[in-house]
Amino acid sequence: IRMGSAAANLVNREFESHGPRAILLTDITYIPLCGRFCYLSTILDACTKQVLAYAMSESLEVDFVLETVQLLVKHHGISLSKETVIHSDQGTHYTSLKFIQLVENSALRRSMSRRGNCWDNAPQESFFGHMKDELASEIPGWTSFEAAKASIDRWMDYYNNDRCQWDLAKLSPNEYYHYITTGEYPAGMLPLWVK
């Protein structure tokens, strides 16, 4: 991998204060699979907690990280701006010239955690922890990469659409995004005294 330089930390742990699509967090996690690992790359909106893009791979080559950014731009490009920051650690995937060029060509701004400081990307790390906890009973039963991917796909759909979170006004990430961009609280979720 041809390497570029690390980027400055533009986020400084101010994850939620800039609104939706302003700060996007990305990272890779290792997932056990039949005595080896498969790998998951995600891009998480720091404000809404939505998983905007993700890709899985059986290899740690940079391609699946690039695919994650490409999926982000394909599905959410219209809601991104030239001020949108994509924040990562200083791992080789994120300092590779391929990643740097893709992010710059996508008109996104790079930001990086300080070396070895997981707190600088804490919401992303926390997301992976919750995901693995909630999938703990399924992971041992995965017998193939396809089975792992199908399970992750189901969980991502559940997470974005149905997994309500206290910090998101008791809404799912997708409901919360709708709420903060339109001001409309989902009718089925209104407290009884409001109906």
What positions do the PLM features span?
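Mobile genetic element proteins and their domesticated derivatives, centered on retroelements
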Residues: 11, 27, 43, 49, ...
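An active-site-proximal beta-strand-loop segment
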Residues: 13-52, 58-60
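Short small-residue beta-strand/loop micro-motif enriched in glycine and branched aliphatics
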Residues: 50-54, 110-113, 137-138
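C-terminal domain-tail junction helix/linker
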Residues: 104-108, 130-195
